[in-house]
Amino acid sequence: MAKGKYAANILKQTRKDARWKDTYYGRRVLGLNVKADPLGGAPQGRGIVLEKVGVEAKQPNSAIRKCVRVQLIKNGRQVTAFCPGDGAVNFIDEHDEVTVEKIGGRMGGAMGDIPGVRFKVIAVNNVSLNQLVIGRMEKPRR
C-alpha cells in the first residue's frame, strides 16, 4: 500500500477497484436490483387479476393463504399477490384491476409463512381492500 507524500491517487484508485468486490455495491451501481424487480423500482403497481390461487403455508403452520395471480400493466410480468384480511379474496374477481405493493419481507423477499409471495393487494378497482373488508365501502360495479 502506498504511503508516500503523493500517494493519494493510488489510494483513491485502490478504493475504487476494491468497491467492486462488494456484491451489493455492484448490483446497486449496475441497476440490477431495479431490473430484476417486477415493479421496476416503483413503490406500487397496477395489474389485472388472472386467477385466484391458494398457497400452502410453510411448516409448522397449516393453512391455505388466499392469493391472486396478477399481470402487471407496465411490463406484462406476472406476480403472485397475497390478499390480507378475513374474506378479502371474495371481493376480488378475475379481470379486476388491483394495486399491489411489496409485502415487506427482508431483502425484498417473501414474508412469514407464505413461500414465494413477495407482493400484497392493497386496492381493488381503486378502492382500498381494507375498506372493503371492514364494510365501509362497496366495490364499484363496472
From Swiss-Prot:
PROSITE patterns: RIBOSOMAL_S12 (PS00055). Part of the 30S ribosomal subunit. One of its GO terms (cellular component) is ribosome. One of its GO terms (biological process) is translation. It comes from Methanosarcina acetivorans (strain ATCC 35395 / DSM 2834 / JCM 12185 / C2A). SUPFAM superfamilies: Nucleic acid-binding proteins. One of its GO terms (molecular function) is structural constituent of ribosome. Coiled coil: none annotated. CDD domains: Ribosomal_S23 (cd03367). Gene3D superfamilies: Nucleic acid-binding proteins. This is Small ribosomal subunit protein uS12. InterPro entries: NA-bd_OB-fold, Ribosomal_uS12, Ribosomal_uS12_arc, Ribosomal_uS12_euk/arc.
